[in-house]
Amino acid sequence: EPFKISIHL
């Protein structure tokens, strides 16, 4: 999920 990856970054 791109959204979760963005939060991780």
Swiss-Prot record:
Keyword annotations from UniProtKB, A to Z: Amidation, Antibiotic, Antimicrobial, Fungicide, Secreted
Keyword Ion transport among record annotations: no
Top-level lineage group: Eukaryota
Subcellular location field: Secreted
One Gene Ontology term from the biological process aspect of the record: defense response to Gram-negative bacterium
UniProt modified residues of type Leucine amide: 9
Secreted listed as a keyword: yes
Principal location class: secreted
GO cellular component: extracellular region
Tissue localization of expression: Found in the hypopharyngeal glands of the worker honeybee.
Function: Has antibacterial activity against the Gram-positive bacteria S.aureus ATCC 6535 and S.saprophyticus, and the Gram-negative bacteria E.coli CCT1371, E.cloacae ATCC 23355, K.pneumoniae ATCC 13883 and P.aeruginosa ATCC 27853, and antifungal activity against C.albicans. Lacks cytolytic activity and do not induce rat peritoneal mast cell degranulation.
Annotated protein name in UniProt: Jellein-3
Gene source species: Apis mellifera (Honeybee)
